[in-house]
Swiss-Prot record:
Protein name (database record): GRAM domain-containing protein 2B
Domain of life from the UniProt record: Eukaryota
InterPro entries (UniProt xref): GRAM, GRAM_domain_protein_2B, PH-like_dom_sf
Source taxonomy: Eukaryota, Metazoa, Chordata, Craniata, Vertebrata
Modified residues (Phosphoserine): S238, S255, S265
Length: 445
């Protein structure tokens, strides 16, 4: 950058030289001193040639002088423009260098911070869980919560051979360390309605539900990669779909037991005899009505033999189907019988339930009627007692003031006795009604 700036300043200095005579005078002395001297000598020679041309053609003097006058200004502007362009490019390059340096610095700082945080997490992990060997590094840790009677907020630590959880709630430390080889199930689930945020990790004896996972899928993938034995067991325990088909094919007969050799032996003999007869007829070349009749007889005989053989061959198939059909029916009948018995039981229960319901309703109505009657009898007894009280209150003042006649006294005594008898009779009736109610209630229970 410095060299370019110096060259541009040299060019400006060259263009500021005014006179051609001085340059022509100084040219022979400084012809080999510097590149600027070479440029000046060439300019002097060009000036001499221009003068000769001007002497030959005076009309061309004015445009050449204007061009010579304008050329220094143009060269100065070009020099300034080149300076500004060089300065702008240098500034841009400096800015780009600063940006790249800042990016690299930020990346290195991030790497340093992540490595330091990972180192701190690893140290904390080994400090909490002493069962894990110190040579085994921590792969990753996740913030989550263990779901029990309450949520225990904490961290889930995953290493190569261990899955550990630690939380401290209400001053109580809960630590769970699960060896990776003891895990029998890893399942995704969700405790919220819409957010899938939970994982189930099960062993032979325990089952843990970790909720509030921010990145459940990455956690699931990491734990799945740690528990590689689960993939092997899932592949080994995959059912063979062809086993049922093979058993079905083994139970099924390969072919139907059809023996046509014995059944169609007679038919072969008839056909051979018929061929011999036809050959004899063709050799003789003459046909008589007897031969035609015999031929018809043989044809009808062969047809009857075919019909007989068909009739004999059909029963085995029907027998085979018949022997299979009863088995199928025997297999289907128990289920049908069970369904019928279940339907009958349901009908009986549906019949029994309404009868019990009606009986309970009747008992309830009777009990209500008895309760109402007892209240009514109690009301009547209270009214009678009030009347007796009023009568006695009326009779007491008359007895104090004047003695009542003997006739009236006897009548009053009779009335009191009658009332007492009626009351005792009513009380006896009430006791009977109460006993009956108790018996009905006991029977209803």
């Amino acid at each position: 950058m410095v060299k370019k700036r110096l060259s541009s300043s040299d060019n400006v200095f060259k263009f500021e030289i005014p006179s051609n005579s001085k340059t022509s005078a100084e040219a022979p002395h400084s012809s080999t001193d510097s590149p600027s001297s070479v440029f000046l000598s060439s300019e002097a020679e060009n000036g001499a040639e221009d003068r000769r041309r001007v002497s030959k053609s005076p009309t061309a003097q004015s445009p050449t002088s204007s061009v010579e006058a304008e050329s220094p200004d143009q060269k100065r502007s070009l020099g300034l423009w080149s300076k500004s362009s060089f300065d702008g490019s240098s500034l841009l390059s400096d800015k780009n260098d600063c940006k790249t340096e800042s990016k690299t610095d930020s990346k290195t700082e991030r790497k340093k911070s992540s490595s330091s945080s990972q180192y701190k997490a690893n140290m904390h992990f080994h400090k909490l869980f002493l069962d894990v060997p110190t040579e085994e590094p921590l792969r990753q840790s996740f913030t989550c919560a263990l779901q029990k009677e309450i949520l225990y907020q904490g961290k889930l630590f995953v290493s190569e051979n261990w899955i550990c959880f630690h939380s401290k709630v209400f001053g109580k430390d809960t630590k769970i360390s699960i060896p990776a080889f003891s895990v029998t199930l890893i399942k995704k689930t969700k405790t919220a309605l819409l957010v899938p945020n939970a994982l189930i990790i099960a062993t032979v004896t325990d089952r843990y539900i970790f909720v509030s996972l921010l990145s459940r899928d990455s956690t699931y993938k990491l734990i799945k990669s740690v528990c590689g034995h689960l993939e092997n067991t899932s592949v080994g325990n995959s059912p063979n779909p062809s086993s049922a088909e093979n058993s079905f094919r083994a139970d099924r007969p390969s072919s139907l037991p059809l023996d046509f050799n014995d059944e169609f032996s007679d038919l072969d003999g008839v056909v051979r005899q018929r061929r011999q007869d036809l050959e004899g007829y063709s050799s003789s070349g003459s046909q008589t009505p007897e031969s035609e009749n015999s031929r018809d007889f043989h044809v009808t005989e062969s047809q009857t033999v075919l019909n007989v053989t068909k009739g004999e061959t059909k029963p085995p198939r029907t027998d085979a189907h018949g022997s299979r059909a009863p088995d199928g029916k025997a297999k289907i009948l128990p289920a049908h019988g069970q369904s019928e018995t279940i339907g009958i039981l349901h009908k009986m229960e549906s019949r029994k339930c309404p009868t019990l319901h009606h009986i309970l309703i009747v008992y309830a109505i009777i009990v209500c009627a008895l309760i109402i009657s007892t209240f009514y009898m109690r009301y009547r007894i209270n009214t009678l007692e009030e009347r007796l009280g009023t009568l006695t209150s009326i009779m007491d003042p008359h007895s104090t003031e004047q003695t009542a006649p003997s006739g009236l006294g006897s009548q009053m005594q009779l009335n009191v006795e009658v009332l007492c008898q009626e009351l005792t009779a009513n009380i006896v009736k009430l006791e009977k009604i109460q006993n009956n109610l108790q018996k009905l209630l006991e029977n209803g229970d």
